[in-house]
Amino acid sequence: MRIEMKNISKAFNGNPVLKNAQFMIETGEVHALMGENGAGKSTLMKILTGVYKRDGGTITIDGQERTFKNAKEAEEYGIAFIHQELNILPNLTVAENMFLGKELMYGKTGILRTRQMNAIAQQQLAELGLHVKGAMLAGELSVGQQQIIEIAKALMTNASVIIMDEPTAALTDREIETLFTVINKLRKEGVSFVYISHRMEEIFSICDAITILRDGEYVGKRSIPETSFDEVVSMMVGRSIGERYPERNSQISDVIFEMRNGTKKGKFENVSFQVRKGEILGVAGLMGAGRTDIMKSIFGYEPLDSGQIFINGQEVKIDSPIDAIRQRIAFITEDRKSEGLVLDFSIRENLALPNLESLSKGSVLSNELEQQFTADMMKLLNVKASSGEQAVKSLSGGNQQKVVIAKWLGIHPQLLILDEPTRGVDVGAKKEIYSIMNKLTEEGDAVIMVSSELPEVLGMSDRVLVIHEGKVGGILEKDEASQESIMALATGGE
């Protein structure tokens, strides 16, 4: 299937989002669609699949002009869209999610062919390297496993074109390798992939070509063998952003945080490590190793069953997030939309949530203090929005992440825990988040950064804590850390 989109325009409430955008993909091609958050990538694909109606321009498929009325019509034609936000119903089984709307039944009885659906689901997932029971509840799976279910659902529609919006954001390196194997197999069979991602290494590894949008406009198209990382970044942001990871200039001094023999039954055991003032401690490991569980215990979401926590040399009890906040510990979770933000609230309201005490006069929330705090934080973190009253659900991924970080900066954290801080964030916003981390450590605070992106771990960390199956696999100094040494420890080696 060959698709060509020409001069596509779209505005929301009079604000242009796409201006004469273009995109073309050939049969069997893996084509990256890149641009900063808010560049119009997802909007362009939603126009292709009938989610949005275009204001202008043409779409031709195999030489015939076409317009889809809705996503179902596009899917029936052979175009599937796997969105960044997972479309998984946690209370349904794996098989029920995969067959939703396409259930197998015994004739017209309405009775489901459950055993057959379970078997097909298991087979499809096994081909993607995921071995789970079709009868298992989807909510019991990790985010990465749920992402693979989404991919399998798209493959089950016999799609000729599969649009993937940040498909690997929650996948481990092994799962990504499995996905790429599947993509390479399908491209040989004539299936095309639109690959929306901010992960440069992946794009240069799996894609044939790149189309770049900036501020809703078409910037250009490049063949992968004929371009470079620097050229793509420059085309995306309209300028050179310099080194990918900013230089670290902080002075590392005394131990600010220590966990001794921390244990949470069924999650992790006998975990011991320290973090020092001015330090960024990277935390690496395979998905399900227990990295996030350890961070949740530090913040009091899931208190330790046994073990000790020390802050500045003093033992403290952290049995709830309130206890953690009193110790000036902040935690930015991996799932900003369900755990880090109230999407229907404004930027101002989200920023105020953990800072009600400092923004109040007496027992009354001060509108003046709230407005000033919002303005200061938006300026400090370069949050791009019309005003502090804009709903966070309407912000790009990068700006949403900045709001999450901003609200916690209000407590002046001495320890900031970041779980997958740049997931789904464009290269420009990533650089800004890295700069915020550096600024905190230069002021003598400490950062723990959990990340599945090994280049990020290596580029930003002073030391790397590697977790393997709920235990400390090892701790690497900066000059010892490499992708190979981290993966060796993460998989149980030495």
From Swiss-Prot:
It is an enzyme of class 7 (translocase). It is found in: Cell membrane. Keywords: ATP-binding, Cell membrane, Membrane, Nucleotide-binding, Repeat, Sugar transport, Translocase, Transport. Its EC number is 7.5.2.7. InterPro entries: AAA+_ATPase, ABC_carbohydrate_import_ATPase, ABC_transporter-like_ATP-bd, ABC_transporter-like_CS, P-loop_NTPase. One of its GO terms (cellular component) is plasma membrane. The keyword rRNA-binding does not apply. Its main location: membrane. The keyword Kinase does not apply. ATP binds at G35, E36, N37, G38, A39, G40, K41, S42. Pfam families: ABC_tran. Residues 3-240, 250-494 form the ABC transporter domain. It catalyses: D-ribose(out) + ATP + H2O = D-ribose(in) + ADP + phosphate + H(+). Signal peptide: none annotated. Part of the ABC transporter complex RbsABC involved in ribose import. Responsible for energy coupling to the transport system. Belongs to the ABC transporter superfamily. Ribose importer (TC 3.A.1.2.1) family. The complex is composed of an ATP-binding protein (RbsA), two transmembrane proteins (RbsC) and a solute-binding protein (RbsB). PANTHER family: CARBOHYDRATE TRANSPORT ATP-BINDING PROTEIN MG119-RELATED (PTHR43790), D-ALLOSE IMPORT ATP-BINDING PROTEIN ALSA-RELATED (PTHR43790:SF3). This is Ribose import ATP-binding protein RbsA. It comes from Bacillus cereus (strain ZK / E33L).
